[in-house]
């Protein structure tokens, strides 16, 4: 079962793009009774998003930009996930989990991220190093 998360949900780790769906986000929201967040995304125009949780507990952020659909050939939302989940199960099984949850097939996928567990782990390490250095620098400033 798939459930909607609050609009203020945030991933615990770094975000990574998993795939792009070839079905409109409004259709998915209507099918599952979810509410979309509509907003202006700085520099990218009008967007619609929703956070959902899969039965496994993994969270997704689906975002669709009107400009991308109207002018760039985008067919549906980008699916972003916590990189730690890709590192755990890899891209292809994760895409399959998303498709099963939304009752979609591979024909409903426009693009799959060309990454693997190792790349996700590298991104997680980079992300963790950045925050450790930032926090360390912040603590040094406070000690002066």
Model-derived features with residue positions:
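Generic structural motif
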Residues: 2-4, 36, 106-112
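Non-cytosolic coordination micro-motifs
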Residues: 69-144
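Hydrophobic beta-strand residues in large extracellular and virion-surface proteins
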Residues: 28, 50-52, 60-62, 79-81, ...
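Amphipathic, interaction-prone secondary-structure segments
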Residues: 34-65
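Catalytic phosphate/metal-binding cores of nucleic-acid and nucleotide-processing enzymes, i.e., regions
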Residues: 8-12, 34, 68
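Amphipathic alpha-helical segments
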Residues: 18-38
């Amino acid at each position: 079962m798939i459930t909607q998360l609050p609009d203020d949900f945030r991933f615990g780790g770094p975000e990574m793009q998993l795939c792009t769906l070839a079905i409109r986000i409004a259709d998915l929201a209507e099918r599952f009774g979810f509410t979309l967040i509509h907003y202006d995304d700085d520099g990218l125009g009008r967007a619609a998003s929703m956070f959902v949780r899969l039965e496994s507990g993994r969270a997704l952020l689906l975002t669709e930009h009107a400009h991308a659909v109207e002018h760039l050939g985008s067919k549906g939302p980008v699916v972003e996930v916590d990189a730690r989940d890709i590192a755990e199960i890899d891209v292809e099984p994760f895409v399959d989990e998303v498709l099963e949850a939304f009752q979609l097939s591979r024909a409903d996928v426009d693009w799959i991220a060309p990454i693997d567990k190792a790349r996700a782990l590298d991104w997680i390490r980079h992300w963790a190093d950045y925050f450790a250095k930032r926090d360390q620098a912040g603590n040094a400033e406070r000690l002066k």
